[in-house]
């Protein structure tokens, strides 16, 4: 394991050589697993979202924030951790398959979404980095395994943004299926509001 998580913390970075460019603005966002020990699968931890502000503060420092993507199931885990079990890179509980939200950050129309290959996309607030809501209801996605709150919904973590249509396109597929049952692949479109629409492809 080449990476090490650090949990929720903030930094103020100093420019130690040269000059920070004055013609940049906005922020850079990075997400990855908050993995703090070398054992186990690299993807098997909750997503830690990092925000690097490109405009220095009054003292010329670069602000860096880290926040755990605190989904409802992550909050349940803090209270009822004994109900959760890790199997390779998945986490299972009576609530379903935990959406670890740790693989990709996608922005469109001033909104930000985090992807994970075994869960619905999640919207987060780009200013506070706090969890807002999953994209679509569970019923709108193809489910590979049941779950009360989070069924296993295999949704490719890297959607395609269509800025003209103001929409996100996803691949939603079956990761596992019973013997004799063919796996399915669907193209999904979400217009940033309302229901997710899907079309089966072969």
Can you name each region flagged by the protein language model?
Residues 1-202:
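Beta-propeller domains
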């Amino acid at each position: 394991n080449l990476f090490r998580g650090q949990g929720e913390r903030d930094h103020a970075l100093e420019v130690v050589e040269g000059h920070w460019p004055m013609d940049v603005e906005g922020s850079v966002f990075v997400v990855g697993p908050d993995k703090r020990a070398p054992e186990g699968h690299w993807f098997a931890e909750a997503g830690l979202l990092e925000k690097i502000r490109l405009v220095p503060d009054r003292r010329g420092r670069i602000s860096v924030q880290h926040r755990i993507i605190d989904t409802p199931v992550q909050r349940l885990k803090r209270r009822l951790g004994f109900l959760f079990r890790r199997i390779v890179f998945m986490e299972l509980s009576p609530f379903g398959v935990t959406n670890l939200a740790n693989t990709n950050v996608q922005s469109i129309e001033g909104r930000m979404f985090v992807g994970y290959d075994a869960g619905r996309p999640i919207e987060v607030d780009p200013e506070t980095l706090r969890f807002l809501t999953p994209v679509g209801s569970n019923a709108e996605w193809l489910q590979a395994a049941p779950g009360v709150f989070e069924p296993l919904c295999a949704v490719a973590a890297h959607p395609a943004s269509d800025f003209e249509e103001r929409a996100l396109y996803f691949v939603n597929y079956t990761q596992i299926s019973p013997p004799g049952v063919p796996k399915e692949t669907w193209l999904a479109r979400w217009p940033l509001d309302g229901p997710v629409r899907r079309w089966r492809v072969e």
